[in-house]
Amino acid sequence: VWLGDDLNKLILNSEGEYRHGDNRHNNEHDSATEEAELQLLYSRAITAYWNFQAGWRGDLQPTPERHWLALGLEGLAPWFIDVNATLFVGNEERTALRLGLEHELMFTQRLALVPEIELNVYGRNDLETATGAGLSDVTAGMRLHYEITREFAPYVGVHYWKQYGNTARFSRVDDEKTDGAEFVAGIHFWY
């Protein structure tokens, strides 16, 4: 959700994962909110295709909560690749970098396939959240969405995720999965 104009925007992003049944973190058959992230960002256009963003990110799940200062660039690279690169700085000298890339392949005016990839890199180990320094995880996938209106598009898709380095080691020690595939469904909307 955003409020503003093409030059200045206030953006509220939320992302979460709710799992039903077989749980990738502990192989139990339960249902729970696995991950919840909220971002409040100020976005300023710096060129016709690029925005500078600054604000706050809160990792609300898994516990303990982590709060970060966010600084990033979001825009459209050549060949219509959407890029989102954000540096996060948290307390106790925590740092993170997230890079996301996606490209919309239009089949019709309303139906599109969106391949995407996202990677997360952390500056130090965080034992409480089982996050390791270095390349932590990569998620790659595809979403198929249908725009009922330009502002409202349900989607289905599949994602493959894999943990690396110390993050994978922490997961193996806790007898958790370090990779897997999952089906996703949701609604993309804006107003």
Where are these regions (language model features)?
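Outer-membrane beta-barrel "beta-signal"
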Residues: 142-147, 177-191
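Transmembrane beta-barrel strands of outer-membrane/channel proteins
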Residues: 12-16, 54-58, 85-89, 115-121, ...
